[in-house]
Design a protein with these regions (language model features):
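C-terminal structured interaction module
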Residues: 115-146
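Hydrophobic, often amphipathic alpha-helical segments used for membrane interaction and targeting
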Residues: 1-111, 130-131
Length: 146
């Protein structure tokens, strides 16, 4: 089954900590929770109800998303992730604006010496507003690593 203990953050932390590699997050948990708080109350309620209503299908949906990502099918992943999304304000706040901010950070970081590894959730790597699309708009090419 799916478990937070098997998440990307935990896997990365397990690799960097013993090697004393510097690491940080692009965002804090408080910032992420604040994204919801900044949305209109009716949008928050609809989103909560959509999440609750979708619980019975979550494993099937996650399996489909993981399969699309493993195939390298970013557009298929974007379709699966956004098929139930009826709130443009939600998508803009949770995905597009954050992708734009991260792309700006990456662009700025490329002007500094050293190597940086950036990991973000798969939902940020698919669709028109993806991190890659935001980077491409700045003339930066990103490549998916298997």
């Amino acid at each position: 089954g799916y478990s937070a203990s098997n998440g990307v953050e935990e896997a990365l932390e397990a690799r960097v900590k013993p090697r004393n590699l510097p690491h940080s997050a692009l965002e804090t948990m408080e910032f992420q929770l604040g994204l919801f708080d900044g949305l209109p109350a009716d949008v928050q309620r609809r989103y909560l109800m959509d999440v609750v209503d979708g619980i019975p299908d979550i494993t099937k949906e996650l399996d489909g998303m993981i399969a699309a990502w493993q195939r390298g099918d970013a557009e298929g992943l974007a379709r699966l992730m956004n098929e139930d999304e009826e709130e443009p304000a939600m998508m803009d706040a949770l995905i597009t604006q954050r992708n734009r901010t991260w792309a700006t950070w990456v662009q700025s970081r490329l002007d500094k010496p050293g190597t940086v590894f950036v990991a973000v959730g798969a939902g940020h790597l698919a669709g028109d507003g993806s991190v890659q699309a935001q980077l491409a708009a700045r003339g930066i090419t990103a490549h998916r690593v298997q």
